[in-house]
């Protein structure tokens, strides 16, 4: 597959950002997150089949850029740059926007997509227009038009101020503006998360390592895509349950992947090591049920579940450990970290995380989920996306990282799993795993 870049430009907000909003102060929780770009690719079929493909591409290209400019007026920090550890310069420099053409039809690509080919659709950093400090850009976008007129929208969003829900809210606003381009669209009002968790310059610069430890690229790793359909999830949840509890989709899938990853590591390394699983818990619904989608920034905390030789590795046992740790991050847990006095509690909990990660002989796995966040509800006027994926980047640093997404139907789960090469060789042939999921299934075949 060949991808040819046609143009590169900056899309600026259609209305200038007021002087009093030129500096966006990030929250205390944002301070804990590295400014890494997280890419997601949305694939849309060409639904305008009665119109010549060149005309479809020209029209789509124009309206996407115009509606993006309108949307950025409300999401003004996204058109700026990360200034320093505690602020974003909302300078209206604009979103770096690339347009390209793909030599294939989209259906050909989706028949058997692979991570390396998908990464060709991400915004490249080689252009002179893309400065050397590319990680300082808050958002970069590439629109890749296939031979059939279908389009892949690749959006790289800086995790520094954008978590999964913030990202999806932005995309929905852009899509809604595109659908009603001739109308006056009102984007959601955003309450900055800094008002909930005030920033503090005294936070140690190495605090990021307490949230994301030992996940750096220290060896060769590979990524595989795993699909659980609805019926398999029903069976898996039943197997992972006990007389005292019934797991959620996230708990059952995470527990199974964790169990099989532990087994794969034991087989490839010839020894049984302690295992630590970190997971994220979204705060929004717990603190602001009515406006939870409209709070911008990182509003989550990392929890930790641990397993060792003496704790057992049965599926229902691992799932119960995970459930118990998730339940600890409740409304009281969150409220203690809010306000002016929350800084001390955050520092205290960072130390607890550091202690959980002290065992350098343990295997660490990081789980993150955007299930139930509405990733397939982003409709630009062409219907639901044919497929949504997170391909990572060519210079991704993370290993032992697992992302969970909804399938297009909403009742399945797609898992993107990155493991050490030797562990993956064992993991992908685990019969217990294969009883519930399939590897590298074509998105065209997924419900």
Show the residue positions of the predicted features.
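Low-complexity, glycine/alanine/valine/leucine- and proline-rich hydrophobic stretches
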Residues: 357-447
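Soluble acyl-CoA-dependent acyltransferase catalytic core bearing the H(X)4D motif
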Residues: 2, 6-21, 34-35, 39-372
């Amino acid at each position: 597959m060949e991808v040819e870049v046609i143009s590169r430009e900056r899309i600026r907000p259609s209305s200038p950002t007021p002087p009093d909003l030129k500096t966006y102060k990030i929250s205390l929780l944002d301070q804990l997150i590295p400014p890494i770009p997280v890419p997601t690719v949305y694939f849309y079929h060409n639904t305008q089949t009665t119109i010549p493909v060149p005309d479809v591409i020209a029209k789509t290209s124009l309206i996407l850029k115009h509606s993006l400019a309108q949307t950025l007026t409300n999401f003004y920090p996204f058109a700026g740059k990360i200034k320093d550890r505690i602020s974003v310069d909302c300078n209206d420099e604009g979103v770096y926007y690339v347009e390209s053409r793909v030599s294939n039809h989209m259906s050909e690509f989706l028949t058997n997509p692979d991570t390396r080919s998908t990464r060709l659709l991400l915004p490249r950093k080689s252009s002179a227009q893309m400065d050397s400090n590319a990680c300082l850009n808050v958002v970069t976008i590439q629109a890749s038009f296939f031979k059939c007129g279908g389009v892949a929208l690749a959006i790289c969003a800086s995790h520094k101020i954008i978590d999964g829900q913030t990202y999806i809210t932005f995309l929905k606003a852009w899509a809604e503006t595109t659908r009603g381009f001739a109308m006056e669209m009102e984007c959601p009002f955003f309450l900055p998360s800094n008002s909930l968790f005030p920033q503090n310059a005294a936070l140690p610069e190495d605090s990021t390592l307490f949230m994301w430890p030992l996940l750096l690229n220290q060896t060769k790793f590979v990524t595989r895509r795993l699909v659980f359909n609805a019926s398999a999830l029903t069976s898996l949840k039943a197997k992972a349950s006990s007389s005292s509890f019934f797991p959620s989709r996230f708990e059952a899938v995470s527990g199974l992947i964790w169990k099989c990853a532990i087994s794969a590591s034991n087989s490839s390394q010839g020894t049984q090591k302690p295992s630590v699983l970190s997971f994220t818990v979204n705060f929004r619904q717990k603190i602001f049920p009515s406006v939870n989608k409209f709070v911008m920034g990182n509003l989550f905390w990392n929890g930790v579940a641990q397993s060792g030789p003496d704790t057992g590795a049965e599926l229902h046992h691992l799932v119960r450990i995970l459930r118990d740790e998730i339940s600890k991050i409740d409304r009281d847990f969150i409220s203690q970290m809010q306000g002016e006095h929350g800084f001390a509690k955050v520092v205290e909990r960072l130390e607890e995380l550091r202690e959980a990660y002290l065992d350098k002989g343990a295997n660490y796995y990081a789980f993150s989920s955007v299930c139930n966040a509405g990733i397939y509800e982003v409709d630009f006027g062409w219907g639901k996306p044919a497929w949504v994926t997170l391909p990572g980047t060519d210079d991704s640093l993370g290993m032992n990282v697992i992302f969970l997404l909804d399938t297009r139907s909403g009742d399945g789960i797609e898992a993107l799993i990155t493991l050490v090469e030797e562990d993956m060789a064992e993991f992908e042939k685990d019969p217990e795993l294969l009883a519930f999921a399939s590897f590298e299934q074509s998105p065209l075949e997924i419900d």
